[in-house]
Amino acid sequence: MTKLFRRRLLKFLTYAMIVFCAYIIQTTPGLFDFFGIQPILVLPACICIAVYEGEFAGGLFGFFFGLFCDSTSETIFGFNSLLFLVFCVFAGLATIYLFRRSTMNIMLLCLGAIFLRSVLEYFFGFILFGYENLVPFFYTRLGPQVVLTSLFSFPFCLLFRWLHGKFEPETTKV
């Protein structure tokens, strides 16, 4: 085992432990519960991994931790894993080809991803089945969840940027 391989293995195990801890915090009842609304912490963490490590690693993290979220979600199984995969691959490719890797861009990517996820959950979970008078639900539950999750994307961005800098080999730093 080479030193570079051990460093990468330790880096991705550290990433996995952080995202798993975010999942545990996300699914613990009453923890980070603001007026009955809990943020989705796994998605911003996976998007930050995709931004700093590329679309392949981000897509894998998004898919596998999306499966974790599917196991505790009220949506159909596979909804979160498919969306997290698409969002993370898009975030990784967007930072390679379109955007700079700045904190503001990462936060905007997280905001867009969580907003799109909430709109799709609202559509496929409620509108498609013909429930009526659900506009207040969107504004009182899903809207604040989008804002709360976006606020938590800032610490994740700083944490993963710091970790990426610590684990990056000296020969590849620019």
Regions found by a protein language model. Name each.
Residues M1-V174:
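Terminal, non-globular segments
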